[in-house]
Amino acid sequence: MEKRLMLAVTISIVLMLVYPLFLAKISPPTIENNMQEDISQQLDNTKVTRTALPKTTTVTADSKRQLPEDAVSTPFSTTRYGLIFSNIGGSIQKIVIKDDKRLDSDLVEDAMFDAGILAIEGDASLRGLSSQSFTITRDTNTLYTEKDGLRVEKTVKFLKDQYGLRASIALTNISQASKPISFQITTASNISSKEAYESRYIEAGTYHRNDKMQRLAGGKLKKSNELKERDIYWLYLKNKYYSIICKPEFDVSGVFTRYVSGNPVIGFIIDDRDIQPGETRTYEFKYYIGPTEIHELEKVDDSFGKALNFGIFTSISMVLLSVLKFFYSIFHNYGVAILLLTCCISVVMFPLTFKSMSSMRKLQELQPKIEKIRAEHKDNPQKLNKEIMEIYRRHKANPMGGCLPMLLQMPIFIALYQTLMRSVELKGANFLWIKDLSMPDAAFHMPFSLPFLGNAINILPILMIGAMILQQKLSQVKAAGGQTDQQKMMSSIMPVMFGFIFYNLPSGLVMYWLTNTLLTSTLQFSLLRKT
């Protein structure tokens, strides 16, 4: 049964660690009643109109264009943002998130030409607009230009005390002839993926009026896609901790994704009726640009909370996150909050854990009898199985009794793993010697690096190895013939393997596993004393 226990735990760990990679290849499962599909799958089943932009105005990964000599970068600063506008294309080139809870973060960098946020590229008078020089007026946060009888004016208004802004695009026909309006506007691009393993969390997607989420991640985000649908409510691009969400205040024709110079670029497709001489047409957008934190998201728009996704067990993760934040509101330290959350989970899971341990203990005590029967009936498999099942029946032991309770706990383990891996609340949070609970604890640094481990000495994974060895010692009972070589090998290898897996994971997650292991060991010790 010890092998079954190790198998169950190993499956749990593998699922938790492989899950982020798995998410990059499939669409996330439902969140409450939300249907979530992959955009690429939708493209296979939906008639899509593809409009290739002119090659002369598109930056590709193979030919990165340089800004002209007359390029001017103009900074705008608020309590929440540091933005840099470029006069070339009249777009946002860089975004720095200001956060009093954690270090400022460079969210977007080097977004130029049609990859610049709010950049427009289209047909007729709008062709080449992403390379056009704009005039920037700081007093009104306005950028404007004129091209082929069309005046284009972009205005940005910042929302007070929120990670939000409103952007408007005003097109005025200053010619004597009507002008066709068909263009693409970039709403998000070049989102940061500097932190270790962060690129696996980069995803884009759309939220629809029928409460449906569509997402695109991993290798599929590197392909050019266009989806012509008019029920799109908003579009997002996010990394592990931060999100850029854009909600149009009008009906769009669809969305597009591109991969420019190694970065994802997303935006809206707008096919509108011709604009008449003297007419002005305005397109309004609401933006959220900030940490993926539910109360900040919902400050800007009630529906933006849908962007917070922890995977298949999001509903459980949201409960765990609420409990974590409740403890933080009392003790003002996320390290303490994680310890208390771990204790709460252990209390809730106690009946299942106790049942699992009791069942395994009973099966271990029956091992001498089972081994004796194996020796007596080794040449008669049918008789052997019958005798073993009779022993289980007589002693009211269930061979699956140790594994099943653990498997029932797996959703909580996976949900908590995702919560501690993705919650921006832990970013920059310290505890004891740990400077950042979203990163390995890195108590010391060596002058050299080890393969796969790096040069940091992480104390928590080492303590976790010791705790797991202690837990295994407590779970062992003396059986006839002692432990098999296989059991001894498992006892030696498993803690080291787990320590290796957890070595560079966030310290908040490792702290949970260490605390949970110690609590489980205490329960095992109490059970051992009673038997």
Outline where the language-model segments fall.
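Generic N-terminal leader/processing signal
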Residues: 1-2, 45, 145, 152
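Short, charged low-complexity linear motifs
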Residues: 1-5, 70, 221
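Helix-loop-helix
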Residues: 1-41, 85, 169-170, 186, ...
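Juxtamembrane extramembrane loops of integral membrane proteins
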Residues: 21-104
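Generic low-polarity alpha-helical segments
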Residues: 26, 64-69, 76, 141, ...
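Intrinsic low-complexity, intrinsically disordered segments enriched in polar/basic residues
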Residues: 33-34, 56-66, 135-137, 158, ...
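Soluble non-transmembrane domains of integral membrane proteins
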Residues: 75-306
